[in-house]
Amino acid sequence: MIIVTGAAGFIGSNLVKALNNLGRSDIIAVDDLTDGTKMFNLADCEIADYLDKADFIEQIAQGQFDGKVEVIFHQGACSSTTEWDGKFMMANNYEYSKTLLHFCERNGSQFIYASSASVYGGSDKFIEQRELEKPLNVYAYSKFLFDQYVRQHNFTTQVAGLRYFNVYGPREQHKGGMASVAFHFNNQIKASGICRLFQGHDGFEDGKQLRDFVYVEDVVKVNLWLWQNPGISGVYNCGTGQAQSFNDVANAVIAYHGKGEIEYIPFPDKLKGAYQSYTQADLTQLRAAGYTQAFKTVEEGVPEYLDWLAAQHFIGQ
């Protein structure tokens, strides 16, 4: 069987759907549905069972899954970069991940997990090297620490981590303020015809802060490729390799709707010193490992995403 943690979340649910498209429904979906609206992400998916994340880790400890699991796609985490409860973050992200990793090692199961580009923090280079990793918040630190743990041990099973850059696309609507700018810009254009972007900061002009915006479909493809290549382990960047500006995203949304304009708002004081103004994945190691597929640009991915959003009807919309 296949286990997907964070299965009702953004990337996890896209992964479940992609596995369904490959003919797999022997999937245990693990999540926390305290936010019941996340069920929409699984409503069109086929799974064998659903387990709350606390019940799942208990059953792992009891040995109920021993010898039964082909792969764990560990996508579940507290992903809020504004959460500063370190004790909670370490238990939820770091210790939980270690428990699943050691289960996979004992059982010979593949372990493919979500890391994050946030581990690079204020760095201006994004290469999988220790000296470039400078986390700026406790979420990033929890991800960094687990990557370090993986690096320090020689596991006999596949252990592969993907440092996601700025992922956007279908099934992120439950994330609220943490959803992508593509999602928010789309809502803003529909509501008022105006996209609101931050003014210049940190040496960047208005709206010209640069991020590596990567479409969720492409992120899922890298996960599936790792699963299909169990001999590949390590920690890899997962982005397009090409930074684009927030203006690019706003203009893609405006072009899609055929209307709209951009308004620049003051850069928030609370984000100063804790904000990545530039990210761009260095894909050298991923390419060297054998991944050859192309990644969609903002101009390609955003219209596809907005087509999907236009066809959805979520609670509150």
UniProtKB/Swiss-Prot annotation:
Enzyme Commission number(s) of this protein: 5.1.3.20
SUPFAM superfamilies cross-referenced by the UniProt entry: NAD(P)-binding Rossmann-fold domains (SSF51735)
Catalysed reactions listed for this entry: ADP-D-glycero-beta-D-manno-heptose = ADP-L-glycero-beta-D-manno-heptose
Residues engaged in binding substrate: 166, 177, 184, 198-201, 211, 275
Cofactor annotation comment: Binds 1 NADP(+) per subunit.
Sites where the protein binds NADP(+): 10-11, 31-32, 38, 53, 75-79, 92, 143, 167, 175
Any single GO BP term: ADP-L-glycero-beta-D-manno-heptose biosynthetic process
Pathway the protein contributes to: Nucleotide-sugar biosynthesis; ADP-L-glycero-beta-D-manno-heptose biosynthesis; ADP-L-glycero-beta-D-manno-heptose from D-glycero-beta-D-manno-heptose 7-phosphate: step 4/4
Keywords, comma-separated and alphabetical: Carbohydrate metabolism, Isomerase, NADP
Active site: 139, 175
Enzyme class: isomerase
Requisite cofactors: NADP(+)
InterPro entries, alphabetized: Epimerase_deHydtase (IPR001509), Heptose_epim (IPR011912), NAD(P)-bd_dom_sf (IPR036291)
UniProt-recorded Gene Ontology molecular function terms: ADP-glyceromanno-heptose 6-epimerase activity; NADP binding
Main function: Catalyzes the interconversion between ADP-D-glycero-beta-D-manno-heptose and ADP-L-glycero-beta-D-manno-heptose via an epimerization at carbon 6 of the heptose.
Domain remark from Swiss-Prot or TrEMBL: Contains a large N-terminal NADP-binding domain, and a smaller C-terminal substrate-binding domain.
Similarity section: Belongs to the NAD(P)-dependent epimerase/dehydratase family. HldD subfamily.
Subunit structure: Homopentamer.
Protein name: ADP-L-glycero-D-manno-heptose-6-epimerase
Encoding gene (name): hldD
